[in-house]
Structure formats: structure tokens, C-alpha cells
Amino acid sequence: MLIVKPVQDKSEQERYCAECMTGFEPDALCYAAFVDDELVGICQFRLMAGGAHIIDLCRAKGTDDLDALFIMGRQTMNFIDLHGVHECCFDESAVAELSVDFAKKLGFIERGGKLWVDLNGFFNSPCEHGKAGSPR
């Protein structure tokens, strides 16, 4: 069973980052995804006045569950939107781990050399974003 949960303990977040071979960002918020109690990935992100930044959306070493990462990415985006931040950037480090195509499936588009998503109404009409978030 897939479980995506917020990571509130910073030492736990640091351990999960090590398991995902990514840098620990102590001032970032974090979600972790587990399948049958096994860590499959994490998402570190920041809420900022000019928009949120997804710093990392990455797999744990030895795992390849892209469905879990997709769900965790969308959960992160929903959290960001619900907290009043309606623009979100997919940082270059996050893109390097996955791919531009994966970010676009989440709903991001290229704008000004970066990947952005406008979350205004994004979760009100999910069908509006096409299959797996890609524009129609």
C-alpha cells in the first residue's frame, strides 16, 4: 500500500535524503513516500512569497516507483496550493533527478527557462489538465 506522509522530524528527513542520495535541506518541508513500509522517495520543497520551489522529487536508491513519485508530487502541489501559494517552480536539481517530461506530466510548463505551474484552480477541475496532468 502506498503511503505519502509529511516528515516533521529533521533527523528522519536527513536519513531519508541519504537513502535517496540527495542533499538534506534543513529549512525545507518534506514528504516521504512508502510502499509496503519501504521508502520509495522523498519530496523537499519550500513555500516562498514569489512561489513555491520543489527542490527534490527523487527515488530511494534501488527503487523505481514513478507512480508513487507522481502521487507524492501532486500531493505536494496540492499542499502548496492549499497554503495560499499558487505558483510553483520545479528546481533544476529536481528536473535532473527525473526528467522534464515527468515534470510536464505533473502539470509544469516551461516558462522563462524554468518549469512552472499555476496552481490557481488546478485541483478544482483535474480533467482540465488532460491525462496525468499534460495539457490537452
Language-model features and meaning:
Residues 98-108:
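Short, aromatic/basic amphipathic alpha-helical patches
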Residues 86:
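Short acidic/polar active-site loop segments enriched in Thr and Asp
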Residues 89-100:
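Conserved beta-strand-loop-alpha-helix junction that forms the acyl-donor binding cleft
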Residues 1-25, 126-136:
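Short amphipathic alpha-helix that is part of the acyltransferase structural core
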Residues 32-67:
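Conserved donor-binding loop and adjoining core beta-sheet/short helix segment
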Residues 64-81:
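Conserved acetyl-CoA-binding loop-helix of GNAT-fold acetyltransferases
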Residues 27-29:
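Short loop/turn microsegments at loop-to-beta-strand junctions
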Residues 106-136:
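C-terminal "cap" of GNAT-fold acetyltransferases
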